[in-house]
C-alpha cells in the first residue's frame, strides 16, 4: 500500500452524541453489581487491545459463555493484561440479562474487578425507530439492530485501548491469539492500514485502530438500515483509503456450530436454526493419495478426525455422494491445521452436483457454489441451486506440494423426499462483496 491512510478522506463527522443519550455514559445500563464498573471504565488505564462482542438471547447453548471461556483459556496471563473484553448485552429481556450477568460475574469475578471484563447494555428507547409497512421483520430492521448494537459497542470502546478487535458470541480462538495479532501489527506501520482481518467470515476477527471507532460508529448509525455490518465495515475501510482486504494468516477465530450468526439468519431468509450438520448419510470418494490412517470418509464426520493427503494436483477432488438427493441450505469446508494454518488447500472450489448415474454413482452436472478463501468456505445456498443435490465436491484448482489436511465438510439440509416443492424467489438481488487477499 502506498503512503499513509487518513480519516480525513471522509467528511468530518461529529462525535457520537445521539439525542437519545442524555449524557456521555447515560445509555449504559448496568446490573447493580456493576454500577461502579461504568465509572471505572471512564478512568481505567488503556489496554493494548479491546475485544468487542455483542450478544443476545437465543435458543440452545449459551455461546457467549463458551466464547469467553475460549478467550481466557487460549490467552496467557501476560496477554490478558494487555486485553480488555467488552461485552454489549444487546437483548431487552430482563430475565436473560440478569441471568447472563449473574452467570458471568460468578465465573469471571477477578476479571471484572480488575477491569479486564466490562458488560454494558443500551436500553431499547436508545434505538432509532425503523418503520416497516408489513407486519413482519424486514431486512432493514435486522440490519438496523445489528448496526446500532455495534455502534454502541464501538462508542464505548473508543478510549479503552489502542486497538479494537471485533468478534462474535459463538466463536473459539486460536492459542495465544493476542501475541499473534501483536506480531502482525508490528510488521505494519500504523498509518498504512485501516482494517486487518484475522478471519474470512463476515465481521468476525476484524481489527481496527481505536482512534477510528467514533467515526465508524457514526458511519454505522448513518446507514443503519441500508446494509449489514460486514458490508459497511468493508465500505468504511475503502472510504478511509485501504482499497484491498488484508487477510492475516493463520486465521485465529472460527465459528462454533451451535447456531447461526445474526447476520446469516438474515441472508437465508428465516429465523430458525438449520438442522445439525451431517444429518444426511453419504459416501466420500477421492482420487487423491491417502492412507488407512486418515481415510476420505473422515472428512465427513463431526469428530476431530480429518482426511490427509499430499502433493495434490489440478483436477483432484474429494466428493461426498449422498445416499438420497437433498435440499441443502449451507455448506462449510475447513482445511488446514487450526493452530498454525498449515496444510490448507491453497486454491480450490466447492461444487454442487445433480442427477447421479452409474455404479458407484457419479453426478452428471455440477454448479459452482464458491471458491475457498485461505483454505476455508462457509456458504449459504439459494434454493434455486440447493434443490435435489446429490454431490458436494471439493475440487483442487492448482498443483500443491506437501501435505493437505481436510478437517471437515459439513452440510445442512434435509432429504428432498421429505420436503414440499420449492418455490424459488428471485426478487432478492442484494449484492455480496468479494474479498481480495492482500496479505
Swiss-Prot record:
BP term (GO), one: protein glycosylation
Pathway: Protein modification; protein glycosylation
GO molecular function: glycosyltransferase activity
E.C. numbers: 2.4.1.-
Pfam families: MGAT4_cons, MGAT4A_C
Record's keyword terms, sorted: Glycosyltransferase, Transferase
InterPro entries attached to this UniProt entry: Glyco_transf_54, MGAT4_A/B/C_C
Function according to Swiss-Prot or TrEMBL: Glycosyltransferase-like protein that may participate in the transfer of N-acetylglucosamine (GlcNAc) to the core mannose residues of N-linked glycans.
Protein's recorded name: Alpha-1,3-mannosyl-glycoprotein 4-beta-N-acetylglucosaminyltransferase-like protein MGAT4E
Originating organism: Mus musculus (Mouse)
Biological classification of the source: Eukaryota, Metazoa, Chordata, Craniata, Vertebrata
Gene behind the chain: Mgat4e
